[in-house]
């Protein structure tokens, strides 16, 4: 296990890539994710880092929305046959999930039978999506919210499950 602020992930990129190529069972813990660390200024806002890690073949990337997802993310990282990047926020986040989204890659956390739109978030933005869904509902727009902590894990699910999350 190794860790640093997420904005410094670029300094670790060669080691992360080599770990993925060699299927090394390493857990990289990155903290201080999201624009929620605004008081540190733009040099400490890791805007593009998540996308760049997600394209490394063999690297499992998990960005939990809350402590429930973080617990399950650790379980998944400990059993994954290769490296995992756990991308964690700095700020305290409300509990918005039961944690199962991590196992499946994505899960509906706010369901509306009459949803006109689906808001998708990862990490700290899931709670923002939940708040946005409430505001939309007050304006007469029904919305569902999906937490998607791991694109790769979601893509591995059967099409029936994927279609149930995104009808």
Predicted regions and their residues:
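Short catalytic-loop micro-motif centered on adjacent basic/acidic residues
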Residues: 2-4, 60-63, 120
